Each structure stands twice: as C-alpha cells, then as structure tokens.
Amino acid sequence: RFSPDDYKNVVKNAERVYRERPEYWQKLLTDKIELMASVARKNRRPLVTTECWGLVDYKDWPLLKWDWIKDLCELGAITAARTGMWVGVATSNFCGPQFVGMWRDVEWHKRLTSIIRSSPIDASLMKNNEVAAKLLKRL
C-alpha cells in the first residue's frame, strides 16, 4: 500500500481529483463529522481525533501544494469543534512540525488552534457523565 508508486500517484492526481469536485469532498467530510458527533451525542461520549480531515498519503516533497489540504483540514477542524462533541481536535494529519510545507503558514495553525480552544464543549458531556469527566480531567 505505501510504495513510492502510491505516493507518486497521489502527487500526480489527488489535487486534480479534489479540485474537480470540491463541494463533493467537503460535504462528504462534514457529513461524516456530523454523523460522528450525532452518535457521540446520543451516547454521551466525547470525541478525540489525532489523525484527521483529509488525505494521509501526502509527503513534504518539494513544490507540493498545501493550500487544498489546508482548506479541507480547516473545514474539518472547525466543523468538529463547532459540534461541541470533540474535546481533542488536531488541525490535520500533518500538524507535526516535520511537515515543513504545512508549517510555512504558522498563522494558519495559530488561528485554528484559537478556534478549537474557544469552542464550547456540549453540555451533555458535562452533566452526570463519569466517562467524559475522567477524560476531561486528563486534558
């Protein structure tokens, strides 16, 4: 699955495939986030996501564009944070500083971190919920 040919295929095609139908991919992402939030709300369980919001087979190769990746990651992080069910939200699968292409835009990370940190947690997670209380204590 993770051969160099796979990465070359992603580099060659992924952005084009996304840009041909961005609304489709964005709606697919937000619909799945809303579905997970709905299930979490029904079960009164908090969500934490560390690997998220888009493509995972992307490398920090020279000249790769990150704007479309960042657009999807921003949409995913903000959508998740607004549900109130996520108590831990990563900005992307590439949020580690080893991804130079992603970290060129430090302000993007700061802005998303601010949105995530200021998003309220759903009240259903706070009342009489031992599981959520234990997790939230650790955060």
Per-range role (PLM):
Residues 1-57:
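Glycoside hydrolase catalytic-domain groove-lining segments
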Residues 59-139:
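Aromatic-rich peripheral "rim/lid" segments of glycoside hydrolase catalytic domains that contact
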